[in-house]
Amino acid sequence: MKTDFVQSGGFLTIDTPFGANDLLLDGMEGAEGISELFKFNLFMRSGSSSLSASTIVGKNVTVTMEVEGGSKRYIHGIVSRFIQSGYDVDFATYQAELVPSLWLLTLSRDRKIYQTKSILDIVKAVLGEGSITFSDKTSGTYTALDYCVQYDETDFDFIARLMEHAGIFYYFTFTSSGHTMVLGDAASAHISCAGASTLRFFPRTGQTNPIDTVYRFEFEKRVALKSATVSDYDFIKPATSLSGNNAATTGSGAIYEFGTGSATASESTAKAKIRVDAAQVTSTLLRGDSFAYALNAGTSFTLSDHFISTLNALHVVRRVHHTARDDLYSNSFEAFPAASAFRPPMVTPLPRAMGSETAKVVGPSGEEIWTDQYGRIKVQFPWDRDGKGDDKSSCWIRVSQSLAGVGFGALFLPRIGQEVVVSYLNADPSRPLITGSVYNGTNTTPVKLPDHQTQSTIATWSSKQGTAGNIVRFEDKKDAEQLYFHAQKDLLTEIENALTTTVIAGAEIHTVKKGDRTVDVQTGNETHNVKGTRTLDITGDETHKNGAKFTQNVKGDFELVVDGKLTITVTGAVQIKSSADVLLDAGTSLTSKAAQALTQQAGTALTNKAGTELTNQAGTNLLNKAGVNLTNQASVQLENKGAMIVSKADAMHNVEAGAMLTLKGALTQIN
């Protein structure tokens, strides 16, 4: 095989990790475009049939195109494939595929969370991690996103869809030693094409045309989308419209897009304009063929000498297909008027989270519950390699409840350490929603299963550092049904109207193990109806206080047994009335005392009787009176004593003694 050839002097040359003349570039074919990965197929030969693919695959290679007296055009990239395609007597043939370093991002797939970063910041971060050389020529302002997720998509697809969503395009510029990804969002990002800033329209004559000419140039007009409406929903401002619209002056049709992450109506309007611009740029197409090997996608050139004067203007190259063989070169290209606002088409699909997954509730160290005013929580996904399991691991995520109204509904907040079920609104990984909780090997069920599989339970846990909590438990076991309430501390029941408790059969027991029990009827009555017996067993004192009348009605016997003293104090009158007998029985003495008058009256007979001594005493007068007979009798001695004693009878007064009658005084008068 030949080994004595050199590259110098040819239109095509190549610089590879091999020796300067180990490979000879015979031909090249490939394409580059705005917001597209360029790819060039290289056709080469070598005097060596044993070139090692590992030496060149993944390495930088530069292709140079140059004609005598012309500028150099470089195409730089990395070799993604290297093929030994054949050989003959003199040479071995090889092929290689040249791609940008950005292509390497198509090989990496990940799940990754970005918080409080704008789309442009996220794109730059991914490019930086991938060691991609880029230049930022954007001029727009990009709002920080609360939450953005790369979800089972390549790094390239992730940033591609973000840029398409935001209207950011990219293209590549080249030097002999590298290539640069240029980011843009306006016409100002399109630089003038070096070596082809002005091209002449020069129809092909069959001869080799100059390198500054376009020999075919077509103009095409299409019907494109006219208007777009973009909208979203903000739960913090649910009544606020976030809809925005934009329309072109020409075109037809309308699209409606919901769930774009807009925080304001003006953001939606801006996004609607991006959608319309992306469609409208296709309404005017310019196609051409040329020998201008310097044409570079994303750059601009001015066309001159066209017979349609309106085409002699500034245009931007959207796409170029290059073909070179030995010293021959031509290209075909697409362009659009520089006055058009280019936006990349939305071709990269949004990944869909079809279904649910679980995550762990997280928060700051030392906290057991972490939430905001809307009852949102934060989680750590098991796939998130960057999260630290703290309050920075995710955005605030809303929690689905069984009922949610204006100041009413259900509210159960998942706590730090619990495993929750995460679903996604519209299957968008960047819009998570907590829809439930699940038990696991650490967070076990509140009842032992399957032993108590008939029990349904709501059990909470005291915070902080609690060891138990409140419980509502339903036991549905046949013939052992039970509804159990446990308050870890206080149980407060507040009822706006009536409370009815009915015990069909069985007992009702109230037990206060320690503390007081108070029944406070502030307005209204209290009624107790007991068809059986009622027992009050009080170890200490009992006090009854009535602000008004107190009445007890007893149909049977009423018995009051007092082990100590019985004191009845009445500010008014006291009346004891019995249809039968009244017995006052004192073990020692019985005293009837009145501040003024004491009257004892019997319809038939009144007997005051003492086993030893009976004393009737008055401070002034003592009157014993009977309608018929009055008898004062003593078995031994009856004594009437006073400063003055008067015994008087209207008819007859009989003073009689069975043995002796003694009347004695300092002065005794019998009249």
Each model region followed by its residue ranges:
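Assembly/oligomerization scaffold segments
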Residues: 1-112, 165, 283
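Short alpha-helix capping/helix-loop boundary micro-motifs
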Residues: 41-51, 280-291, 346, 403-409
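Short, well-ordered loop/turn sites that connect or cap secondary structure elements
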Residues: 55-56, 295, 389, 414
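Extended, domain-scale alpha-helical bundle/helix-rich regions
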Residues: 71, 87-88, 117-134, 140, ...
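Glycine-rich, acidic and aromatic/proline-enriched surface loops and short helix-turn segments
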Residues: 99-101, 116-137, 258-270, 364-392, ...
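Structural signature for extended repeat/solenoid scaffolds and their inter-repeat hinge/linker regions
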Residues: 183-184, 356-633, 637-641, 645-648, ...
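Acidic, low-complexity/disordered segments
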Residues: 297-299, 308-359, 433-441, 445-456
